[in-house]
Structures are given as C-alpha cells and as structure tokens.
C-alpha cells in the first residue's frame, strides 16, 4: 500500500507545483537527513478577500498514512486555533476529511485546502468542535468577528 500512497503523493506534489490557487502553499516537510517526507505536508491557507479572515495565511499540517488515498489525511491548524469546526487540538472537522462521510479517494490536496478555506468563513454550526467559537458565532457575532480579525493578524502572509 505504501507504494500506492507515495506514488499518489508524488503525483499530487507535481500537480500542485504546476497549478495551485493563488496565495496557498503546500509542500512536503523535510526529514532531518534532508530528504522529503511525502507523508507530512506544511500548508498555508489564505483567508478569502472581503471576509474577516482576509489578511491571514493560516498554517496547516496535513498528515497522510500509507492508506492514502483510501483514507483521508488528518489536517491540523495550530493548537487552540479559533474556529467552530476546529478542535482545541487543531484538528479540522470537515465532511470531506471524514471517511464515513464525504471522503473519496479522488479528493485531492487542492480540493481539501480549498474546502478548508471555504469552511473558515462558512462554519458548520451542526458540527461544532469547540465550545467558545460556536457559542460566539451563534449568539454574539460581533465578538466572534472581532476574534477572527485578531487571529488574522497572528498569521500574516509569509514574506
């Protein structure tokens, strides 16, 4: 199975380098010996323009297993990332990342990152992962928006 997953991840890397959405980045991490680790990717997701997320590029780690693409990657923002659909551990709660829901082996890294970007400004109140963000999102949108804007300043675009 490792052969299938590493071949698919190599292909994904090639496709990403050839064509990826503006402002995003996604690259395999580097092992201590300098070789690429195709199973752990460092990614950045820009906030959409004209949203409270604009101005930030949000760091995300994508971790793949040797069962990829049969099983989805695990996607994590930094610990305590403020969003209704992100667990305190940073793990993203999104249906396309759920094997029992909408995951399909045809889903690409690009599709996942675009889906997470969309989730940032369009949280799913039916699938909350954190108490405070969902509470503010539903009951005090002004305070929620203030926290989101403050978070965008914590994650400026890379220079």
UniProtKB/Swiss-Prot annotation:
Ranges of residues in domain UBC core: 4-157
GO biological process: protein sumoylation
Keyword field contains Transferase: yes
Highest taxon listed in the record's lineage: Eukaryota
Protein name, UniProt field: Sumo-conjugating enzyme ubc9
Organism of this sequence: Dictyostelium discoideum (Social amoeba)
Pathway(s): Protein modification; protein sumoylation
Known function: Accepts the ubiquitin-like protein sumo from the E1 complex and catalyzes its covalent attachment to other proteins with the help of an E3 ligase.
Active-site residues, record numbering mapped to chain: 93
GO molecular function, one term: ATP binding
Subcellular location as annotated: Nucleus
Pfam families in alphabetical order: UQ_con
Main subcellular location of this protein, as a coarse class: nucleus
